């Protein structure tokens, strides 16, 4: 049976792990969200999130955005290649509804997978 958990091993945890993604990444972006990715040596993808206070002022809004992105990653982790991904949230994402944000991030997962595999 396929597991859809978001365990600790599926997260980027240390500053060094985040920093490595910023060096020569594969990119997929929209006006509101940018995904940066590099291949990893693990047998699964890993996710790191950054939601700047500059773009999303309220903590509950930042948490909502991170929750939707984590949930989408959790559900699509088996379709994503073995890469480390950092999600950068920019201005405009705060006005998006959860369903709209979910749809956008799904589109970006597919775009990133195509760029990595193609």
Swiss-Prot record:
Pfam families: Ribonuclease_P (PF00825). Keywords: Endonuclease, Hydrolase, Nuclease, RNA-binding, tRNA processing. GO terms for cellular component: ribonuclease P complex. Coiled coil: none annotated. GO terms for biological process: tRNA 5'-leader removal. Its EC number is 3.1.26.5. It is an enzyme of class 3 (hydrolase). It catalyses: Endonucleolytic cleavage of RNA, removing 5'-extranucleotides from tRNA precursor. InterPro entries: Ribosomal_Su5_D2-typ_SF, Ribsml_uS5_D2-typ_fold_subgr, RNase_P, RNase_P_CS. It comes from the Bacteria. GO terms for molecular function: 3'-tRNA processing endoribonuclease activity; ribonuclease P activity; tRNA binding. HAMAP family: RNase_P. Belongs to the RnpA family. Consists of a catalytic RNA component (M1 or rnpB) and a protein subunit. RNaseP catalyzes the removal of the 5'-leader sequence from pre-tRNA to produce the mature 5'-terminus. It can also cleave other RNA substrates such as 4.5S RNA. The protein component plays an auxiliary but essential role in vivo by binding to the 5'-leader sequence and broadening the substrate specificity of the ribozyme. PANTHER family: RIBONUCLEASE P PROTEIN COMPONENT. This is Ribonuclease P protein component. It comes from Shewanella frigidimarina (strain NCIMB 400). The gene is rnpA.
């Amino acid at each position: 049976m396929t597991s859809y958990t978001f365990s600790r091993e599926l997260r980027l945890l240390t500053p060094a792990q985040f920093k490595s993604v910023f060096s020569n990444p594969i990119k997929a972006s929209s006006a509101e969200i940018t995904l940066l990715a590099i291949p990893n040596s693990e047998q699964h993808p890993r996710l790191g999130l950054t939601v700047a206070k500059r773009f999303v002022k309220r903590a509950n809004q930042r948490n909502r955005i991170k929750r939707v992105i984590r949930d989408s990653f959790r559900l699509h982790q088996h379709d994503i290649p073995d890469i480390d991904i950092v999600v950068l949230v920019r201005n405009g994402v705060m006005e998006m509804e959860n369903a709209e944000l979910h749809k956008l991030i799904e589109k970006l997962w597919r775009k990133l997978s195509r760029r990595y595999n193609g």
